[in-house]
Amino acid sequence: MPLDGLHTASTRMMLDCTSLREALAALNTSLGYLRSPLADDPGVRDQFRAASIQAFEFTYELAFKFMKRQLEQMLPVPALVDEMTFMQVVRSAAEAGLVTDATRFHAYREARNITSHSYDRAKAERILVELPRFADDVEYLVARLEERNRVAD
């Protein structure tokens, strides 16, 4: 029975990436609406922008948690992950092949901090430009997590 994104298979805890995949799908849906003719109406565009930013924030938080969870699975002393800084976690994830570019995740963190502390339309528009690449990077992360946590037949 799943417990907080984990389930057992043999003696090893396996990550269940469903919540991250669903968050990513919500982000992609929001971005799709933002690119649609519906967004030609400024009021509707504002709502789609807000939905996209919110989906980004949620997906970002989950992506980082899943990086940490996977590293805990890989390290001989899982508690070491809790002592790592953000950049140590992201660099370790890159070294493990979970993400392709640690510096991009640092930029996503900065974008997340901007969106969580104040709402500024111009800043939100700048962040929107980065969201398709963010979605691609999270898709890569999910694929790597699913590869590592596939239950053997």
Where are these regions (language model features)?
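Solvent-exposed interaction patches of small proteins and small membrane subunits
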Residues: P2-D153
